[in-house]
């Protein structure tokens, strides 16, 4: 939209004041929009990474926690949970199995899948009696799951903790990438113990008169 029809002050919200920039209005276009700007979004690590990390959290039975160590290595981000499980975030090297790919590696090999539901393994034996396609997880499944949980009082698959901590993991990963070094995170206190430089990046100063 044209500058004349944009309430720029309201659009900026609590972010620091800056001159009108039409590129920042395309916040959900991560190729050219404001989603890559720290004041308006956390870039691809949060936008795409959270969709993959939540599956890794689920597989590790870690919906209510997050990795405790994060370190950039060779263009990737390596993280570690308290139980020793490692999480690696990377931009490339995936099989063409749809968006949001995940690979699970163990002492017997690896299994990889994506949004299209196809399973590919390092060894055919890993898929014996499991099938080669598990099907996607359509959005209406989440609706049905939520409504069922309203009745049963169980936790839905996509519960609040799953969303919260997968995003926390991605934010901590971003901080490690920004600093270019290893950081240690406490998922209970939600802080980087003894690391003021990392702790300062957990939030930004709010522009007056905004409060949170």
Predicted regions and their residues:
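Contiguous beta-strand/loop segments that form the cofactor/metal-binding neighborhood of enzyme cores
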Residues: 1-161, 165-212
């Amino acid at each position: 939209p044209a500058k004349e029809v944009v309430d720029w002050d309201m659009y900026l919200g609590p972010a620091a004041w800056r001159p009108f920039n039409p590129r920042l209005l395309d916040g959900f276009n991560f190729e050219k929009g404001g989603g890559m700007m720290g004041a308006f979004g956390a870039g691809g690590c949060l936008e795409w990474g959270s969709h993959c990390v939540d599956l890794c959290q689920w597989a590790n039975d870690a919906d209510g926690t997050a990795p405790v160590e994060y370190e950039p290595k060779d263009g990737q981000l390596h993280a570690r949970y308290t139980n020793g499980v490692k999480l690696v975030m990377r931009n490339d090297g995936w099989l063409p199995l749809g968006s949001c790919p995940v690979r699970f590696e163990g002492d017997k090999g690896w299994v990889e899948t994506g949004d299209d539901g196809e399973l590919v393994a390092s060894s055919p034996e890993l898929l014996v009696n499991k099938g080669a396609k598990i099907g996607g997880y359509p959005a209406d499944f989440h609706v049905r799951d939520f409504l069922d949980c309203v009745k049963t009082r169980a936790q839905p698959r996509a519960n609040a903790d799953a969303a919260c901590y997968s995003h926390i993991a991605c934010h901590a990963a971003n901080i490690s990438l920004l600093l270019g070094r290893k950081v240690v995170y406490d998922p209970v206190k939600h802080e980087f113990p003894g690391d003021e430089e990392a702790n300062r990046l957990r939030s930004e100063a709010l522009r007056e008169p905004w409060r949170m």
